[in-house]
Amino acid sequence: KRILPGRLLGQFSVAKQDRNPIGMQVMGDDGVIAGTVKELWIDQAEVVIRYFEIETLSEFGGRRVLLPMNFSKIGKEAIKVKSILGNQFALVPGLKSQDQITLLEEEKIMAYYGGGTLYATPERQEPLI
């Protein structure tokens, strides 16, 4: 198990000079707040944050979903996600276990956010020229 939630890894913490994203709101590209960061998922081999675990708002299912770090931009007060809209967090693929992620689950999650980069809105689907 290479990538695990911080709750299982007591020896890891966010560096004091960095902003701790736990508790920050997460918003989609449309500015709609989708939920709040509840946990960090750590890659133990490389000692980096790979995912934010988000608790979505009740109108978006009230589920816990993962947001890949590389699809996130951490601001002063919120985390912005350019690839999908706020309401699209409701359909992020889930995990079978709350304490581990499989390679297939990683692929599905990355594909969901990556696909949103091209298909989240009708405007993104058309050619630029």
Show where each model-derived region lies.
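Peripheral interaction segments used for macromolecular assembly
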Residues: 1-129
